[in-house]
Amino acid sequence: MPFSLHFETGKVTSQQLYSEIYQGILEGRLRSNERLPSTRMLSKKLGIARNTVISVYERLQFEGWIVKKAGSGTYVSNALEQTVNQDKRSIKHYQLGVFGTNAAKKPEIIAPKNLDYDFTLGVPDHQRIAKHIWRHSRLSRLNALTPEFAHGGDLQGLTCLRESICEYVRHSRGVICDPEDIIITQGCQQAIMTTLLTLLSPGDLVSTEDPGYPVFRNQARLLGAQIGTVPMDDQGVVVESIPSNTKIIYTTPSHQFPLGFSYSVERKLELLRWAEVNNAIIIEDDYDAEYHYLNTSKQALKSQDKNDCVIMIGSFSKILFPGLRIGYMIPPKSLIDPISNMLWHLGRSTSVVSQILLDEFMRDGHFSHHLLNMNKIYSERYHKLTQLIDNIDCLQRIPSQGGLHIAAEVSGCATQMMNKLVSSNVAVYPSSHFSINNHSNALLFGFGIIPTPKIEKAFDIIQSVLD
């Protein structure tokens, strides 16, 4: 027997022996079908009455933990093993609701891993970012907490940060608004979901660019909406193809995801006229608009929104780092309170400390300096990448002016080309993964985290594989 028991004075001997054997079985020190000492041998070893051992064995046998085998002895039963297996077999399943059933349908994620050359999408160069923001930010205001800070701030977010964002979007995106028009969020995904929860009923029709950002489609489908898709041309979303009765359309006018181009001014105005006539809402995801490399900074769709039908959403994850989890939205004035109230019901959890930190960073000028510095770094990668893509005959680069990735149409099957490159240690991504109706056949090259020297080495491989 793999233990020796030292009895404690004042405690019942039989109970101590029972507990030792019982725990030994539960903890695996006494295994299924292991033979136990006879009552005579164990009583002699422990120096206790044989009747005490007999009573303990009888109790354990009654409970099913040990068994007697005639002419053989006493053994640990397999009761524990059966209990564990039974637990595994009898996992109880519950009926999911509509939202739970929809959420169980996980979207496909394409992400080749552990390749030496990865043109991954949507990830900034955090090595240059995280230490920069923490080094230059001060938390001096935490030493003198105002009631707003101490109680979590306004439903729309801290006033001071909304003031800073107000200045930022005015200078960089041409959007004239007041701090009262801005709602702080955890980022674009939360902004989209909150908007949909506020405005949609099951069965409503929403539309999106095709190819386009899958998160919007997935969230709308989760809530029971019908999904309409709208093809793109080189000017932007084809307005005349927007399905009738569309209640909300999701767009990325400044840097279309995933094709990378910007909407023309004429197409923006056409889209705004459509929304006014159809009493529809446009979600403008200001995706990657912070980065532009051809001395052109186009104004946001929201800046031309005279009829208050655009919900502009933005995030600081690409400028700083995703873990900061701060974004913003600028909805029509009539929707500010309903959306803010919905955020409250969802457990508004944008960190007050992070909001203070970001506000300090912006007010002290570090934000604009950092953005300028990152534009220089990304601009070098952008120009090198455009040059290398243009040197490959089977790639036709889609003109873009900024962002953190470039798209190139291919002659042939983009997915097959991707697979060839992945097998050669280079990760690129086909635009078809973001399309419902296969409206696109392009390869996507993200350059947020891949430095220029690695871009050049990767294209040596790409050229040899594709040519």
Write out the residue ranges for each language-model feature.
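Active-site PLP attachment segment
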Residues: G71, S303-P338
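Conserved core of the PLP fold type I
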Residues: E148-N278, E290-Y291, T296-Q304, Y378, ...
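N-terminal basic, amphipathic alpha-helical segments
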Residues: M1-R141, S334, W344-S351, D359-M362, ...
